[in-house]
Amino acid sequence: MIPETLNPLNYYTSLVPDLIPAATVPIIILICVLFLIWNHEGTSSIPGPGYCMGIGPLISHGRFLWMGVGNACNYYNKTYGEFVRVWFSGEETFIISYFDAWQALLLKPDIFFKISWLCKKYEEAAKDLKGAMEILIEQKRQKLSTVEKLDEHMDFASQLIFAQNRGDLTAENVNQCVLEMMIAAPDTLSVTLFIMLILIAEHPTVEEKMMREIETVMGDRDVQSDDMPNLKIVENFIYESMRYQPVVDLIMRKALQDDVIDGYPVKKGTNIILNIGRMHKLEFFPKPNEFSLENFEKNVPSRYFQPFGFGPRGCVGKFIAMVMMKA
């Protein structure tokens, strides 16, 4: 009685189990064809790994997490050429390894920072750091208001405080600038100096040249600011160290509008990675794959050598870093 109620028209339901496999296969094939057509219409003319129904972006992102940004960029440049299209966190990204064209890949996606209980300890740590920095700046401000000779107490923080007093900066600007110098400078500068010490140990003739120059320029006295322009060999050694073994070998930008780079269309919002580490190994340098001061015996155009980045988003502490490394 129940089967007759459910099937009042007496359809041949016994055939359904036999027909389902036969009908499923064409449907799956049709879906795959539709996916291929959809992917084909959106395929980019720029060389790079295929989209392949969303599998390509997952593999691309996984490679960056597994190999690291620098090694992954070098892999894609060697595999596909100087201009490559890949994906970061689902976003289309271009890697450009030549001179015409830096936290680059965050291991945590944006959604991580939108879930309060996941990033609570990071927010608290940031507040503690900011609070400690504000206390130090206020102590510096109080000290400047009581000293008799300002010349003896002028430094980076003092200049920022005076700029605030003139109305050029806000208190938040001063706090942020000092905080960035404290966070960004120690890591990159210390690693750069570490690499320089290794290169000095490996190249004793370069060490001898620098020592002779230092003795000629300064003698037995301490280094002064006027000595910096005269330390040419030391400067070339610093440049060559940053070229041969860069601490930061990538620069990342986001296209603010549709553009064309070297004939390739770039859509607004696309991430663009400039592979500086590879750019510094071009044939422009006499010995691009060797550590040699000959690479900087002649003036190097800025488009071939960008250790601190470029433009308004370049490293704000590059001049301070050069003085500190020379000293």
UniProtKB/Swiss-Prot annotation:
UniProt entry keywords in alphabetical sequence: Heme, Iron, Lipid metabolism, Membrane, Metal-binding, Monooxygenase, Oxidoreductase
Segments traversing the membrane: none
EC number: 1.14.14.14
Main location, first listed in the record: membrane
GO BP terms, alphabetized: female gonad development; lipid metabolic process; response to estradiol
Record-stated family: Belongs to the cytochrome P450 family.
Protein name: Aromatase
Organism of provenance: Coturnix japonica (Japanese quail)
